């Protein structure tokens, strides 16, 4: 079974959370996700998180604490996602490697079509905030 390790950013500003819509082609195309991407061989997860935010959205970020690690198995692939708390420190938000991005309130995240791993992560956030 192939194993892929990915980083994802939980970025919150003024009570709203940054979400990115995946490009239509590829796995989970068109779904909304916490922005991030695959760790390259030998790459540090925190470095990957910073690189992916710059590549996908044109922003620099402070990569903070690991919030959660979620594992899913789909089509003979295990995908492990490391969710980091991040804060934007520079750059200008742009949809570079995604269809679009938007800031949403916590209640709006429920209605978004998300990959299974992001849905699991968000369920954990809801429980933790109660």
Predicted feature descriptions by range:
Residues 85, 94-125:
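NUDIX/MutT-family hydrolases
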Residues 16-55:
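Conserved Nudix-box catalytic region and its N-terminal flanking loop in Nudix hydrolases
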Residues 59-68:
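A short coil-to-beta-strand element that immediately follows conserved catalytic motifs
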Residues 70-92, 102:
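Active-site-adjacent beta-strand/loop module that shapes the phosphate/pyrophosphate-binding cleft
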Residues 1-18, 38, 69:
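Conserved N-terminal beta-strand and adjoining loop/helix that marks the start
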């Amino acid at each position: 079974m192939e194993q892929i390790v990915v980083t994802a950013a939980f970025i919150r500003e003024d009570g709203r959370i940054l979400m990115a819509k995946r490009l239509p082609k590829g796995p989970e195309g068109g779904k909304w996700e916490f922005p991030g991407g695959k760790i390259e061989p030998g790459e540090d997860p925190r470095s990957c998180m910073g690189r992916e935010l710059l590549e996908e959205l044109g922003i620099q970020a402070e990569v903070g604490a690991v919030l959660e690690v979620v594992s899913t198995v789909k089509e003979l692939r295990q995908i492990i996602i490391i969710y980091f708390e991040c804060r934007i420190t520079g750059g200008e938000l742009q949809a570079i490697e995604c269809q679009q991005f938007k800031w949403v309130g916590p209640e709006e995240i429920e209605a978004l079509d998300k990959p299974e791993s992001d849905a699991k992560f968000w369920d954990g956030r809801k429980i933790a905030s109660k």
